[in-house]
């Protein structure tokens, strides 16, 4: 049974930013009715427009600005690029809007702009337009970034083509970005040596012409929320195997200490792919061939023999099946 909600709140709460059920309710009840059109159907990470163009937009409010493995600049580039990649598009161009708080150190801004330049070069995209605004001290938190991305369509995600037996490929270990950002805040006095996985996913582009059915980058809400949302769209269930899901030892240890389930932690350089059963082995090998994908695993499958249609099930280490729900409240605010 899916979670129910309390009456509509009068104010937006921080929990809405989780990327889970509360965010989905806000979108369904307020945003989609205001702008409903065919391009928004299914809430894609990027919309496919006439002329073979894909278009996406994103906002970044991460706190702190700098964290092990990256900063708000690398995050802005890679987050936008990855939304295009998993939508079946080769990234080409970005826009960049900066909202600066009065008092921001110009040295920090210079460092972030350098990160943006390097990340864009690595992802083979160009920043071609932008805007800059400055607000009074206290009216923003140092720096916010808003991007848009344009790419060339080379494949089309199609949840409607997913069939029982299709395999789920996870491209790498979970949770590294969320925990790197959280530990960088210093709130818990932990030093787990965790680095963000923030990186572009361009190496997955060849999987589209090879027959990948569907992809998503694992951002807010984590793997469990993303696959729950996929399962809800299918006339089948989705099963993932706990013993196949890669989680690094530092992430697992820190998550256990903090009482956090890694299945709900965000990444910024990982994706989950639905592959046809006959092509899954070749696709897994292709992912593992790239340094970012060397720890990729087949973690489960689409099935009609376990659970009910629309459910996401975890085959646990103890041998049982556990129903996984989408995230309902914020675990770690402002991680992207």
Tell me the role of every PLM-derived stretch.
Residues 290-336:
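Acidic, Ser/Thr/Pro-rich beta/coil linker or hinge segments at domain junctions
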Residues 282-292:
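Short amphipathic alpha-helices in soluble, non-transmembrane regions
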Residues 43-44, 265-270:
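Short Gly/Ser/Thr- and Asp/Glu-enriched loop/turn motifs at secondary-structure junctions
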Residues 13, 18-170, 176:
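Glycine-rich phosphate/pyrophosphate-binding loop regions near the starts of catalytic domains
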Residues 275-281:
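Helix N-cap motif at beta-to-alpha junctions
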Residues 152-201, 313-314, 334:
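Phosphate/diphosphate-binding glycine-rich loops and adjacent basic-rich segments that engage nucleotide
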Residues 101-103, 194-267:
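Active-site-proximal betaalpha loop/short-helix elements
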Residues 1-30, 321-332:
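N-terminal amphipathic/basic leader segments beginning at the initiator methionine
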């Amino acid at each position: 049974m899916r979670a129910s909600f309390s009456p509509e709140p009068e104010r937006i709460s921080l929990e809405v930013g989780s990327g889970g059920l509360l965010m989905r309710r806000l979108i369904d009840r307020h945003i989609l009715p205001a702008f409903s059109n065919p391009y928004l159907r299914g809430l894609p990470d990027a919309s496919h427009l006439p002329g073979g163009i894909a278009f996406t937009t994103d906002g970044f409010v991460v706190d702190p600005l700098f964290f092990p493995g990256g900063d708000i600049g690398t995050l802005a580039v890679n987050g936008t690029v990855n939304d295009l990649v998993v939508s079946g598009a080769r990234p080409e161009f970005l826009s960049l809007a900066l909202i600066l708080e009065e008092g921001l150190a110009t040295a920090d801004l210079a460092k972030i702009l350098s990160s943006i330049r390097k990340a864009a070069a690595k992802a083979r995209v160009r920043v071609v337009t932008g805007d800059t605004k400055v607000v009074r001290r206290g009216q923003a938190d140092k720096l916010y970034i808003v991007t848009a991305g344009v790419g060339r369509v080379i494949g089309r995600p199609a949840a409607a083509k997913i069939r029982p037996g299709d395999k789920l490929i996870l491209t790498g270990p979970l949770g590294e970005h969320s925990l790197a950002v959280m530990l960088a805040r210093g709130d818990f006095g932990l030093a787990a040596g965790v680095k963000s996985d923030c990186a572009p996913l361009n190496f997955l582009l060849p999987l589209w012409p090879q027959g990948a059915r569907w992809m998503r980058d694992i951002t807010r809400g984590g793997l469990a929320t993303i696959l729950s949302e996929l399962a809800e769209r299918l006339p089948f269930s989705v099963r993932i195997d706990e013993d196949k899901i890669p989680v690094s030892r530092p992430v697992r240890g820190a998550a256990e200490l903090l009482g956090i389930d890694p299945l709900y932690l965000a990444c910024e350089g990982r994706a989950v792919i639905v592959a046809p059963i006959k092509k899954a082995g070749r696709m897994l090998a292709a992912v593992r061939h790239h340094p970012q994908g060397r720890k990729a695993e087949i973690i489960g499958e689409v099935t009609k023999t376990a659970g009910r249609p629309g459910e996401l099930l975890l085959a646990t280490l103890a041998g049982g099946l556990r129903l996984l729900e989408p995230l309902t409240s914020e675990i770690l605010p402002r991680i992207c």
